[in-house]
Curated annotation (Swiss-Prot):
EC number, as in UniProt: 1.13.11.16
Catalytic-site annotation from UniProt: H115, H179
GO terms for biological process, alphabetical: 3-phenylpropionate catabolic process
Pfam family, one: LigB
The protein's name: 2,3-dihydroxyphenylpropionate/2,3-dihydroxicinnamic acid 1,2-dioxygenase
Assembly description: Homotetramer.
GO molecular function, one term: ferrous iron binding
Iron recorded as keyword: yes
Pathway stated in the Swiss-Prot or TrEMBL entry: Aromatic compound metabolism; 3-phenylpropanoate degradation
Catalytic activity as recorded in UniProt: 3-(2,3-dihydroxyphenyl)propanoate + O2 = (2Z,4E)-2-hydroxy-6-oxonona-2,4-dienedioate + H(+); (2E)-3-(2,3-dihydroxyphenyl)prop-2-enoate + O2 = (2Z,4E,7E)-2-hydroxy-6-oxonona-2,4,7-trienedioate + H(+)
Function: Catalyzes the non-heme iron(II)-dependent oxidative cleavage of 2,3-dihydroxyphenylpropionic acid and 2,3-dihydroxicinnamic acid into 2-hydroxy-6-ketononadienedioate and 2-hydroxy-6-ketononatrienedioate, respectively. Also catalyzes the cleavage of catechol.
UniProt source species: Cupriavidus necator (Alcaligenes eutrophus)
Cofactor(s) annotated in UniProt: Fe(2+)
Stored InterPro entries: DHPP/DHXA_dioxygenase (IPR023789), Xdiol_dOase_suB (IPR004183)
Length: 313
């Protein structure tokens, strides 16, 4: 059955700290074109590879990968909130198949997803519930993290299952590329911050303060008065070109230290793109198109969108 891929950056800062209106308009135009592609494809299932930002996953149990058999979007920043229409039996079968492929993946019957998942669904489908969706969490901010090779193999295992599922499937990678927003770290954290990173579920009294800190960090970043890692368009474009080339195993040589050095601490979200392309590659050779790339300091992100499909289509 057919498969289609859409990968895109996300930002919680849209509407809080925005670039020039023409840049926002260009991003919205590109996302509207992606929605048109999705609408024309009319998927019977959406699989979203997405990170989390200490909103749903914490250090009390931090899996490298997790498949959601039931999930709710928490609505952080201005993202959509509500229950996702997860086909539980299919998600369970997916988890069993991935485990049988020797990829150790966790399973959640009460997954919480944040803007990293919800914004992608909103951009591509206009809602959280237009299509059945299975969220696949990939840890991208909380060391230690799985390698890019493991993310690729996760995607391959997911893709092999989907190729036998008899459905039109949209696979989505949400995250990246180079960026380093002010995400807290456990190493060196105060006792209060460490406790939130370990067991900080449902921290509604703190959410407004966290959002304010992120907005303030974006304003400082734009003003050039920031310690955050600079955006790296050259590195971004090299990574995007690698995905487009079809030589996906080349990501296996990218180490976690090198990703942090070149792209910033949150550039590890490229794992979601790698997994999505891994799922597509399980169907065979593919052709990919880079629809948009721009370094957007206001959003603290190298911002990109790509789409791809099997070469035989």
């Amino acid at each position: 059955m057919p498969i289609q891929l859409e990968c895109l950056s996300h930002t919680p800062l849209h509407g809080y700290v925005d670039p020039a209106p023409e840049v926002v308009a260009e991003v919205e135009r590109v996302q509207a074109a992606a929605r048109d592609r999705v609408r024309a494809f009319d998927p019977e299932l959406v699989v979203v590879f997405a990170p989390d930002h200490f909103n749903g996953f914490f250090y009390d149990v931090m899996p490298p990968f997790c498949i959601g058999a039931a999930a709710t979007a928490i609505g952080d920043f201005k993202s959509l909130a509500g229950k996702l229409p997860v086909p539980a039996d299919l998600a369970l079968s997916l988890a069993e198949s991935v485990m049988a492929a020797d990829i150790d993946v966790a399973l959640s019957h009460r997954m919480q997803v944040d803007h990293g998942c919800a914004d992608a669904l909103a951009a591509l489908t206009g809602s959280l519930h237009r299509y059945p969706v299975i969220p696949v969490f990939i840890n991208s901010v909380a060391p230690p993290m799985a390698t890019l090779r493991r993310a690729r193999l996760l995607g391959d295992a997911v893709g092999r299952f989907l190729s036998r599922a008899g459905k039109r499937v949209l696979v989505v990678g949400s995250g990246g590329i180079s960026h380093e927003p002010p995400v807290p770290e456990l190493a060196g954290a105060s006792e209060e911050v460490a406790e939130r990173l370990i067991a900080g579920r449902n921290p509604s009294p703190e959410s407004a303060a966290r959002q304010a800190r992120t907005v303030a960090a974006a304003k400082s970043f734009v003003a050039g008065d920031s310690h955050l890692h600079p955006l790296n368009p050259e590195w971004d474009r090299a990574f995007l070109s690698l995905l487009a080339s079809g030589e996906l195993t080349a990501v296996d040589g990218m180490t976690n230290d090198a990703i942090t050095r070149d792209g910033g601490k949150s550039a590890h979200e490229i794992r979601t793109w790698v997994a999505a392309f891994g799922a597509l590659a399980a169907y065979g050779p593919y052709r990919a198109s880079l629809d948009f790339y721009r370094a957007i300091p206001e959003w603290i992100a190298g911002f990109a969108t790509m789409h791809a499909e099997p070469a035989a289509v």
